[in-house]
């Protein structure tokens, strides 16, 4: 149980979250309280790079079972480096899981879809093929962290996260944020290939990790 001192979570996205004034963003999370606890109110905030608040909503979490809570955020300003902040508005203990902020405006209006401007730019190139999800990212740093496509389909909230092959480039951070949420998975990749008129070229792990992985090597696989 915490005093009301702004206890919560702060997420900067990838070097800031780009937000446009007047556009709508779907926020969701799964939450629960401890058995017998009173409901807990949470403030869902968007703050700019100067830490000024420009959008705020509240949700009330109740019950010991996991439930999904949603609100729509409509920022009052355009900001290239905003942050998503979740703070407690009342005392209590609450568990949070699968927090998401997603623009309603996506390429072809696909739920969980691509960023509209970048996807359109790619489509305008008229690519013949679309290769995904990459090369070394499929191998992982060892066999345990290889890309497993079956973990990237189905309900987004059930997809396990995985370390990113290149997250070591964020060694200056205590908590490197270059992980794979797998919110963009094989189904979405195939769907996007269709949307841009390109032949899908899926890359599948062959059971051999990157030979250049520090301490990983071939993991006993010849």
Regions found by a protein language model. Give the residues of each.
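Anion (oxyanion) recognition and catalysis
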Residues: 194
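Extracellular and organelle-lumenal recognition/adhesion modules and their flexible linkers in secreted
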Residues: 1-181, 197-203, 214-220
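Conserved radical SAM core fold
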Residues: 207-209
């Amino acid at each position: 149980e915490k005093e009301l001192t702004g206890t919560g979570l702060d997420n900067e996205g990838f070097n800031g979250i780009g937000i446009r004034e007047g556009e709508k963003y779907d926020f969701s999370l799964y939450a629960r309280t401890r058995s017998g606890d009173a409901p807990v109110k949470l403030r869902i905030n968007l703050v700019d790079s100067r830490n000024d608040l420009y959008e705020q909503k509240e949700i009330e979490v109740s019950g010991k079972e996991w439930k999904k809570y949603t609100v729509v955020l409509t920022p009052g300003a355009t900001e290239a480096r905003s942050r998503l902040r979740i703070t407690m508005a009342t005392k209590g203990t609450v568990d949070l899981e699968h927090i998401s902020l997603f623009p309603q405006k996506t390429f072809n209006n696909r739920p969980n879809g691509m960023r509209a401007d970048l996807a359109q730019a790619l489509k305008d190139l008229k690519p013949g093929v679309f290769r995904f999800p990459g090369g070394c990212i499929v191998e992982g740093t060892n066999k345990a962290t290889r890309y497993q496509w079956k973990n990237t389909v189905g309900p987004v909230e059930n997809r396990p996260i995985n370390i990113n092959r290149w997250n070591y480039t964020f060694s200056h951070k205590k908590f490197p944020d270059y992980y794979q949420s797998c919110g963009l998975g094989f189904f979405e990749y195939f769907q996007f290939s269709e949307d841009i008129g390109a032949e899908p070229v899926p890359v599948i792990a062959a059971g051999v990790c990157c030979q250049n992985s520090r301490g990983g090597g071939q993991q006993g696989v010849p």
